[in-house]
Amino acid sequence: MAPVKKPAAKGGKKKKQVLKFTLDCTHPVEDGIMDAANFEQFLQERIKVNGKAGNLGGGVVTIERSKSKITVTSEVPFSKRYLKYLTKKYLKKNNLRDWLRVVANSKESYELRYFQINQDEEEEEEED
């Protein structure tokens, strides 16, 4: 028996999928160890669309900054993991990787947090 082909729906356009990711840099920006505008510029230069960095696909990917939050909006498939990769690359470039980490605080956002160094362990060692 021959496989039955389903007729393709003609004229049916796909709904544009808009992806929106936020990066919350509140803590390091308030402490003055990081500049949100500099980070935004870094993302604009480094995000690749169709294998090309810097052009953001002619408006397909947009980056907006409001105080210390950066929002990346994309109309093409865009990975949240790629945003984390670029953030870590920025932190390494600015020698902040030893103090800050990138943590997902929701399905569509990342947050820069300080490493929590356990001070309780140090106190226990001093007591012994």
Swiss-Prot record:
MF terms (GO), sorted A to Z: RNA binding; structural constituent of ribosome
Pfam families: Ribosomal_L22e (PF01776)
Record GO biological process: cytoplasmic translation
Superkingdom of the source species: Eukaryota
Main subcellular location: cytoplasm
Entry's Gene Ontology cellular component terms: cytoplasm; ribonucleoprotein complex; ribosome
Localization per Swiss-Prot or TrEMBL: Cytoplasm
Keywords: Cytoplasm, Ribonucleoprotein, Ribosomal protein
Oligomeric form and interacting partners: Component of the large ribosomal subunit.
The protein's role, per its UniProt record: Component of the large ribosomal subunit. The ribosome is a large ribonucleoprotein complex responsible for the synthesis of proteins in the cell.
Annotated family: Belongs to the eukaryotic ribosomal protein eL22 family.
Name of the protein in its database record: Large ribosomal subunit protein eL22
